[in-house]
Amino acid sequence: MARGPKKHLKRVAAPKHWMLDKLTGVFAPRPSTGPHKLRECLPLIIFLRNRLKYALTGDEVKKICMQRFIKIDGKVRTDITYPAGFMDVISIDKTGENFRLIYDTKGRFAVHRITSEEAKYKLCKVRKIFVGTKGIPHLVTHDARTIRYPDPLIKVNDTIQIDLETGKITDFIKFDTGNLCMVTGGANLGRIGVITNRERHPGSFDVVHVKDANGNSFATRLSNIFVIGKGNKPWISLPRGKGIRLTIAEERDKRLAAKQSSG
């Protein structure tokens, strides 16, 4: 009988969006326990080795991390399997680079470079609000931060802007129709659009209808919606493609047009 935590992850069972091939080895890095779920995170080793190509092997990643070059959300992280996830800011002071982990329209984490100004804050979705001991109100975010004494107007599903240096809330966006959102789960993962309406289903999942910039509409569960801007102005810079998913035919036409213009 197995007792205790699982310590391994087979390569074939690793999340698809890590984009690991089957034949390079048997195992994949199992993310440490941390603020993001195993299937929704990107371990530091994969980000540095497979995405940025700053290292060739896991040992090299360890050497980079152990020199305390890598910061996530303003804190030095030396664990190579630390689970970085959606909206996390990864800073490498040595090269002066900052990245924000955001999904592209294919549902993978894009290498999205940001300015040092933008690296000072992050957006967090409010998961739950409760009153703790001695009547102190608390708020819990999607990346497991607990913040005391939040603004009483902030409700569940709203998005808060957090200053990474102090961990304080600087601003918030209500979950409301007409606001810009990103889908963080399900079949529409990575798409960005404006919330058009919300269907309430007590006892089941609330469904939210979203319309993207090209006028395509789609629906997803409320739990997959992450508000990223007021009106249609995003509060963060968006990766290439601006979260508009093209159909296969549109992608093909775009590829051919690019080929002709370069050829």
Curated annotation (Swiss-Prot):
One of its GO terms (cellular component) is cytosolic small ribosomal subunit. The keyword Calcium does not apply. Residues 42-104 form the S4 RNA-binding domain. Gene3D superfamilies: 2.30.30.30, 2.40.50.740, RNA-binding S4 domain. Belongs to the eukaryotic ribosomal protein eS4 family. PANTHER family: 30S/40S RIBOSOMAL PROTEIN S4, SMALL RIBOSOMAL SUBUNIT PROTEIN ES4. This is Small ribosomal subunit protein eS4. The gene is RPS4.
